[in-house]
Amino acid sequence: MALILKTYQQQAKDALADYFNLAQSVGSASAFTKLTGLPYHTKLDDVPNVCLRVPTGGGKTLIAAHSIAVAANNYANTNAPVVLWIVPSDMIRNQTLNTLSDVRHPYRQAIAATYGDRVKVCDLGSLQTINRHDVGKSCIVVVTTIQAFRISKTEKRNVYAFYEELSPHFSSLTPQQEAGLEIVTAETLLEQPYLTQADIGRVKHSLANWLSMCNPILIVDEAHNTKGKLSFETYKRLNPTCLIELTATPQESNVLYSVSAAELKTAEMIKLPVVLTEHPDGWQACLRDALLQRQQLELDAQKDSNYIRPILLVQAQDKNGEATVEVVREHLISSNIPAETIAVATGDIKELKDINLFSPSCAIRIVITVDALKEGWDCAFAYVLASLQDMRSAKDVEQLLGRVLRMPYAKTRPITSLNKAYAHVVAESVAFAASMLKDKMVENMGFNKWEADLAIQPDLGLSGGVATPSQKITPEVSLNLQHMPDTQLFAKEVSDAIRILPTTQGAMLIISKGTDSDTFTQIELAIVKSAPENMLKKHKKRLMMPVQLGRHLAHLKLGMQHLHQLHNFV
């Protein structure tokens, strides 16, 4: 049964359809600016190139699967598209290939909803097996990494090599079809000596040329990993119909639609807040309390009508550290943790391979890794992260934190403790640990500053090593203003809830902990009214524009509205 899209996922899909429809008539750049009010980064000439920004845990792959038909129907005008699905690593390539190939998986079902059984999924290694007659009749999805294509000297990559097996796809080409395709050169002969001087000037029967002829729809997952001049030169060689990027942290991208972490929380996609516990006494104490935390959650999970087996994800130190994978495993076993409940997932040891962690018959409750699970691994049963690396030098801890954010069954649980994620870290102070995690959530997970402030909740104490329910904590949040408000006319409720500090750009508005929604509204009105008249006139002028994200007060108002939404985070 296909998954029903969450509201924000459907809105992202609709935004993409609106953009492609408009781009057909006015061009890619004009369509983007008209719909967003933002300047367009032209990197692929007039080929549409847009980005959907979705934070960690938001279901980017499902949106990507649905975007195939959106692009094919609203821009490519084909019912048999060729799709080049680009991922950042071999691990994610294998995972994506498996899920798209599985007719029972929601990602494959999202594609099949449009194309039925006319779907062919392959990687570059098996692309040669695609029948010539499948082209133009089936939706062909090729999953690969950018590394397979990205190089300045193309003769150094197999994807650009001449393959006789591909020759049927290149028969009877017209001069127009041959234009722009790579040809055999003297350099090619050096890499493929079975070719002769007579072949120089021939169109290469290569995988890259075949893709170029097909004008593929490019889908780039985790697009922030594939930026740079060489990447876009590579995209141009592939002669795409359009490019759709998906990432939590866009960099110089044309962001068409942006999802907030607050929307993911509202849509019941992620567990928040993250209850953070610091351990200044070292990794043994960190691991001990994380184990107790997981045990308590398993007791809580027995009250849930759905099966949940909370999993502890342990980030061990690398081979040069004290708490290596081997040491941690032995420590657990010597602490009477059954060996069959422990799995190791590293670059060399892959004990999770072919294991269904969601099965009630699965015994695994603890997964030990270093950084192998930082991407390409998702298990909604993962609840607790224990990072045994010192927070001052911890690597990829935010990536692993993302592994414990997904909500089981994408539905808020009836037990409060099961709606939160838990992080135990080796650090001297919770303030330092929280600051580090917040910065990393903003930089690498797609959270904004307000969301990160509210997403991390310090644990106020442990009882027997198990976190106890704590009072609701709403951290202070701040907003930069481009003017210094006159607070003399502010109501007492407003003055009591805020602090205003002068800055070189204007002022910083600090909203106190625990501020209720009614006071938020009063603060918004007071700040807007306090703005200089010339700023208000500019603001009103902007509001008359058809589509305008605006600056100055428009940013302020958007920020204040967002704070309303975030107020329900914890």
Residue ranges of predicted features:
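Conserved Walker A/P-loop ATP-binding site and its immediately adjacent core
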Residues: 79-111, 145-154
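Conserved RecA-like P-loop NTPase helicase motor core
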Residues: 349-441
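Conserved pre-motif I regulatory segment
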Residues: 1-53
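Post-DEXD/H (motif II) to motif III coupling segment of the RecA-like Helicase ATP-binding lobe
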Residues: 225-273
